[in-house]
Curated annotation (Swiss-Prot):
Highest taxon, organism lineage: Bacteria
Entry's Gene Ontology cellular component terms: gas vesicle
Keywords, alphabetical: Gas vesicle
Stated name of the protein: Gas vesicle protein G
InterPro entries attached to this UniProt entry: GvpG
Disulfide pattern: none
Length: 78
C-alpha cells in the first residue's frame, strides 16, 4: 500500500481498531456460548431445576432442545 496509502487511511485508524475489537469480542462470546462444557453445565442446572420442581416438563424440554441445538450447531466459521 505504501506510505501515501497509509497516510490517507490514518484518519480511519480508530474506526478500524474499533471494528477489530468488536470482532474479537464477538468471537470470544461465541466461543463461550458454544463451549460444550458450558452447555453441559447448563444442562445439569436445567435438570436440577426440573427435579426441584422449579420448572415443568414442557419448559425443560424447550430449554433442553435449545441447548442441544447449540451443541449441534457450534460456532459460526468465519
Amino acid at each position: 500500500m505504501g506510505l501515501l496509502g497509509e497516510l490517507l487511511l490514518l484518519p480511519a485508524a480508530p474506526l478500524r481498531g474499533t471494528a477489530w475489537v468488536l470482532r474479537q469480542v464477538v468471537a470470544e462470546a461465541e466461543r463461550q456460548y458454544y463451549d460444550p462444557a458450558a452447555v453441559q453445565r447448563e444442562l445439569a442446572r436445567l435438570n436440577e431445576l426440573l427435579e426441584a420442581g422449579e420448572i415443568d416438563e414442557e419448559e425443560f424440554d424447550r430449554r433442553e432442545d435449545e441447548l442441544l441445538d447449540r451443541l449441534e450447531k457450534g460456532p459460526r466459521q468465519s
